[in-house]
Each structure stands twice: as structure tokens, then as C-alpha cells.
Amino acid sequence: MTAGQPMLQKKICMLGGFSVGKTSLVKRFVESAFSEAYLTTVGVKIDKKTVDLGERTVNLILWDVAGEDDISTVRMTYLRGCAGYVLVADGTRPSTLGVALSLRERVEADHGRLPFVLLLNKNDLQEQWAIGTTEIDDLRQAGWSVRASSARTGEGVEDAFRELAVRVTAPQ
């Protein structure tokens, strides 16, 4: 960052079904840590991480929104002022991909098109993986950024947030 250049701040929301790993992904990204203990997010939890993109630096304000499998109960008001979002699905539970797809439709209807990345989390559990490559390929063909991730090992986490940081700071 050059002297006198203002620090960019961008609000990023974490969205996905119940128990897909949103909080663990944030913890991995912000603290480079993972905990086996499961804690349910109530409402929203906010964290911050500074990302150096070379030509600029951005503070990502991460809003970890409580996961719901019934998307009608997800509070879209949390997304006000959001520059982009991370959709999270659990690769061992295909129904959570359906929740993520529905959440994206709802976000677009309520807030317009925003940059996003879809993380298929729990990639370390390959023997239990249940989302087919055809579904993933179809989403990529539709222009989606789809990445495998593991909050436990850190696989794909940093790259996904960095990609989103680049996209939300790009000139519109």
C-alpha cells in the first residue's frame, strides 16, 4: 500500500446451511486455526482480516451469519452493505448444496448481483464425499467460482478469500 492511500474495507458475508463449516473457515482464514469443538453461531459473528493484494491492501470484515437449512429464516438484512459473499456447502451432505443454491437466488433477488465464491467444504473427508463432479462442472459452466476447501487442513481457504478480495476491490 502506498503512503496516503486509504485502506479499503469490504464487508463479506458467510452464507450456507447449518453445520457446513462457515465459522471454521473464518477461524482458519483469520487465525490459521481449527477446532474440533462445534459451536453454533447465533445471529452473526464478525471478524476482520487484512489482505495484501500487492497493489492495494483491503480489510475484509467477515460476517459469519448463522446457518439455516430453511432459507426463509436467514436474515437478509445482515447482507446490507455487503460487497460480496462466500457460499459454503458441505461436500459430504448434498442437501447443503441445494441450500447454497437457494441462498444465492435469494441474495440476488434481494441485493442484486454481488461477487461470490462457492466453497465445497470438508474436502478432507474424501471417503464421505457426496457431491458429484457433474454438479460442480455445471456450476462452473454457468460462470460460478467453485472451490474445494477444508477448514481442518486449510486447503483452498486462503485462495478463496484472496480471490473474493480481488473481485470485490476490482473497478466496477
Give the ranges of each region predicted by the language model.
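TRAFAC-class small GTPase G-domain
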Residues: 1-172
